[in-house]
Amino acid sequence: MCIRDSLLASKVTSTKELKNSVKVKYEHKGKEIDVEFDKLIVAVGRKPNSEKVLPKNLGIKIENGFIQVNEYCQTSVENIWAVGDVVRGPMLAHKGSEEGIMVAERIANKQAEVNYDLVPNVIYSHPEIAWVGKNENELKSSGIKYKVGKFPFAASGRALAVDQSVGFVKVISDEKTDSILGVHVFGPAAAEIVQQALISMEFGSSAEDIALTMFSHPTVSEAFHEAALSVNNQAIHIGNKK
């Protein structure tokens, strides 16, 4: 999938199949727009079917198809556990794998947990989109004051060299403590950059910690470094806010 135009707060109202294309009518910002596309992909989401596969006499609580579990993936029946897409949270393979490891450890009477605040999300489009932690809307809703640093791949030497200069890295940190609250990447190697951010956040790094870390040159990872520098108006290869 190649992203050319991304529209939010939009609604498809009708589609019509033509001879060699598909006509799509949608609403955006109060306007009705008609566009023709070569192909139309419809993503309708997924939902669990736990109610159909679990015997009712087990006594396991289910809500909206999801098996109800505690923070350690234990169901309402003491010796039955559930992980992955059938329980709450994002339907991601790595999230389910970590839950499986946690459950195995706890069954063996060992301490283990999953940090659900730091689950990496990746959209494998072209360019890639990836994020971890909070976004600005979530922080505003929670009343948390924050700072933002942003760096475009158009200013990255490596991104320009490989002709993948579309996109940016955004770092959000706490206004007082400077702790990184969220990292969002749109562009080349987004999934890999977010993984670096996740490790940093797992160990409580601040934007300044990343800013003081040496990054290899030329790499697309430097965009993460520059975005962290930008949080405190110290970016090197772009202008800073006054």
Name each region found by the language model:
Residues H94-D117, K145, F203-S205:
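Internal hydrophobic alpha-helix adjacent to the cofactor/substrate pocket in enzyme cavities
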Residues L8-S21:
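A conserved short coil-to-beta-strand element within the FAD-binding core of flavoproteins
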Residues S125-N135, K140-K242:
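Flexible, glycine-rich terminal cap/loop adjacent to redox cofactors
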Residues M1-I3:
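Short, small-residue-biased leader/transition segments that mark boundaries at the very start
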Residues L18, K52, L58-I60, A161-G167:
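Short loop/turn motifs at secondary-structure junctions and domain boundaries
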Residues D34-I107, E192:
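FAD-site-proximal beta/loop scaffold in flavoenzymes
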Residues L7, V35, K147-G149:
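General small-molecule cofactor/ligand-binding pocket signal
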Residues E27-K29, N70-E71, D174-E175:
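Short, acidic, Ser/Thr-enriched surface-loop or helix-capping motifs
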